[in-house]
Amino acid sequence: MAIRVQQAAFDPGQELNALHAQNVGIGAVVGFVGYVRDFNDGREVGGMFLEHYPGMTEKALGKIAAEAGQRWPLLRLEILHRIGRLEPGEPIVFVGCASAHRQAAFDACNFVMDYLKTRAPFWKKEDTAEGPRWVEGRCSDQAAAQRWEE
């Protein structure tokens, strides 16, 4: 399990390939990459600034990863989240799950993203034509996370 919160850009393909390296027991790797969009809620977005709570954010991500590891037979799990200034088209987040079988990898990846969106302390501020604005959580994110508690 690896958790990284960083300002530096990353290569999603390289991250995905690294999950499989030196582990022949892996039969499936599922990855998710989230990108900065150039629009949100009908507004053009010129960029984004991501803030986090150092120490607390990593701890929250570690807890999410640990719970995923308890629920599914994962061989590897990686969570990488960027902070700082990001431009449209840049990757924000990578979640990679590796398992012997695909269903565990798919389910774990969905779970991690659903919980990351609702339980990890990140704050997004978008630059729009009307000026900067903080992005609020979506009800759909809460509903997605809720399904794992049933």
UniProtKB/Swiss-Prot annotation:
The pathway noted for it is: Cofactor biosynthesis; molybdopterin biosynthesis
A single GO molecular function, which one? molybdopterin synthase activity
EC number(s) given by UniProt:
2.8.1.12
Quote the catalytic activity from the record. Answer: 2 [molybdopterin-synthase sulfur-carrier protein]-C-terminal-Gly-aminoethanethioate + cyclic pyranopterin phosphate + H2O = molybdopterin + 2 [molybdopterin-synthase sulfur-carrier protein]-C-terminal Gly-Gly + 2 H(+)
By its UniProt entry, which CDD domains does this protein fall under?
MoaE
The kind of enzyme this is, by top-level EC class, is transferase
User: Can you quote a single GO CC term?
Assistant: cytosol
Task: Give a single Pfam family match.
Answer: MoaE
Q: Is the Transferase keyword given for this protein?
A: yes
One Gene Ontology term from the biological process aspect of the record: Mo-molybdopterin cofactor biosynthetic process
Q: What's in the keyword line of the UniProt record?
A: Molybdenum cofactor biosynthesis, Transferase
**InterPro entries listed in its UniProt record:** MoaE_sf, Mopterin_biosynth_MoaE
Give residues annotated as binding substrate: Y35, V36, R37, H101, R102, K117, K124, K125, E126
Indicate yes or no for the key word Disulfide bond: no
**Which family is annotated?**
Belongs to the MoaE family.
Q: According to its UniProt entry, what is the function of this protein?
A: Converts molybdopterin precursor Z into molybdopterin. This requires the incorporation of two sulfur atoms into precursor Z to generate a dithiolene group. The sulfur is provided by MoaD.
Assembly behavior: Heterotetramer of 2 MoaD subunits and 2 MoaE subunits. Also stable as homodimer. The enzyme changes between these two forms during catalysis.
This chain belongs to the protein called Molybdopterin synthase catalytic subunit
- Which gene is the coding source of this polypeptide chain? moaE
